[in-house]
């Protein structure tokens, strides 16, 4: 948590998990993570972007994941939107890097304009977990030094 993530599929995974965590405990999501990984085909953006109504129904019937219609639709739509960003910027990570650094409100506005089901808390936690904003670990935490050695985007200002 807080380490930089540069792989697009892993970034997508974090976004989907953050979206699904909304209103629930992280423990619930972590217990279902394996199911999410299988259900969303290892969060392969290209594959999820091709999901059909049949795939949506499959996901909504999968007791191993969060079966919320808005969250399932958001995962599929956001995969399609990330594909568009990959075409325009080369990768989702490159799109994030192209906008860095922004303050939290600016990131939230950008995500709201670009994606669906991305409220302020979801965006903040996504950016925190992937190393785009500081605060995942206190400086006194042993993990903080490990995070810093990986040069997360927030440390490169």
Annotate each PLM feature:
Residues 1-157:
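HhH-family (HhH-GPD) DNA N-glycosylase catalytic core used in base-excision repair
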């Amino acid at each position: 948590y807080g380490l930089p993530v540069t792989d697009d599929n892993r970034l997508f995974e974090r976004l989907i998990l953050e979206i699904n965590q909304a209103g629930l405990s992280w423990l619930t999501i972590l217990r279902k993570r394996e199911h999410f990984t299988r259900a969303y085909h290892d969060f392969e953006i290209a594959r999820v972007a091709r999901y059909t109504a049949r795939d949506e129904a499959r996901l909504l019937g999968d007791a191993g994941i969060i079966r919320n219609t808005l969250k399932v639709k958001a995962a599929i739509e956001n995969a399609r939107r990330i594909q568009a960003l990959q075409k325009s910027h080369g990768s989702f990570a490159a799109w994030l890097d192209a906008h860095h650094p922004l303050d939290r409100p600016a990131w939230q506005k950008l995500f709201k304009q670009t994606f669906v089901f991305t409220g302020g808390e979801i965006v903040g936690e996504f950016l925190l977990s992937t190393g785009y904003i500081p605060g995942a670990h206190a400086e006194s935490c042993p993990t903080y030094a490990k995070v810093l050695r990986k040069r997360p985007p927030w440390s490169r200002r």
